[in-house]
C-alpha cells in the first residue's frame, strides 16, 4: 500500500507529460479551424477514445509481444528512453511550416484528424506506449495495475476536458 501513491504520481506525471494535452491544443485548434462546435467535439471524443483504447491494447499485450519477438524489458527501456529523448529534442527544434492547403483539401484532411495525427501519434505516441508497457511490467500487484489503468483513463479524461474547453469560441473573442 505504501508504494501506491508514488506509483500513481509516477504514472500521472509521465503520462500527462507524454500525452501533452496543453501542447496538443494549438495543433488541434489549427487543424479544426473553420469547423463548428459539434464537429470539434466529435473529433475530440473520437481522438481520446481511440488513444485510450490503443494504449490499453499495448499496455496489456506489451509483455506478450516482447516474449513473442524475444525482446527484453531492459532493452525496450533503453529504446523507449531514446524515443522520449528524440521527441524532446524535436520539440526544441520546432520549425514553422509554410504549407498552404486549398479549402477542399483542408476539409478532406480535417475529416480524418481524429485518428491520425491527433489520436496517434500526438495523444498516444511511441513514448506513451513504451511508458505504458514498462509501467505495467513494473506493477507487481493487482492494485498497482488497477492504479495504472485508472491514471491512464484520468489523463485521457483530462485531455478530453482540456480540448472540449476550447471547442467553443470565447465570448470575449472579437472575431466571433
Residue map of PLM features:
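Membrane helix-loop-helix hairpins that form the core translocation module of multi-pass transporters
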Residues: 41-95
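A small-residue-rich subset of transmembrane alpha-helices
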Residues: 37-63, 139-168
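Juxtamembrane transmembrane-helix termini in multi-pass membrane transport proteins
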Residues: 7-57
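Generic transmembrane alpha-helix signature in multi-pass membrane proteins
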Residues: 13-16, 25-32, 116-121, 129-138
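Small-residue-enriched transmembrane helix starts and helix-helix packing motifs
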Residues: 1-17, 94-95, 101-119
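Interfacial loop-to-helix junctions that mark the boundaries of transmembrane helices
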Residues: 2-5, 68-77, 140-150
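Single conserved hydrophobic/aromatic residue that forms the stacking wall/gate
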Residues: 166, 171-176
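Structural signature of hydrophobic alpha-helical transmembrane segments
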Residues: 10-22, 74-82, 148-159
Amino acid at each position: 500500500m505504501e508504494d501506491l501513491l508514488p506509483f500513481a504520481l509516477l504514472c500521472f506525471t509521465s503520462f500527462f507529460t507524454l500525452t501533452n494535452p496543453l501542447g496538443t491544443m494549438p495543433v488541434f485548434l489549427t487543424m479544426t479551424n473553420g469547423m463548428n462546435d459539434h464537429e470539434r467535439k466529435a473529433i475530440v471524443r473520437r481522438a481520446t477514445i481511440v488513444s485510450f483504447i490503443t494504449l490499453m491494447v499495448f499496455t496489456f499485450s506489451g509483455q506478450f509481444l516482447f516474449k513473442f519477438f524475444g525482446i527484453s524489458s531492459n532493452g525496450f527501456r533503453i529504446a523507449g528512453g531514446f524515443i522520449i529523448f528524440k521527441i524532446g529534442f524535436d520539440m526544441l527544434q520546432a520549425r514553422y511550416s509554410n504549407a498552404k492547403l486549398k479549402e477542399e483539401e483542408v476539409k478532406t484532411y480535417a475529416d480524418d484528424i481524429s485518428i491520425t495525427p491527433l489520436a496517434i501519434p500526438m495523444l498516444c505516441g511511441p513514448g506513451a506506449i513504451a511508458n505504458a508497457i514498462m509501467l505495467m511490467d513494473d506493477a507487481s500487484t493487482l492494485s498497482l495495475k488497477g492504479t495504472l489503468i485508472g491514471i491512464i483513463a484520468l489523463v485521457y479524461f483530462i485531455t478530453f476536458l482540456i480540448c472540449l474547453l476550447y471547442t467553443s469560441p470565447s465570448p470575449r473573442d472579437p472575431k466571433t
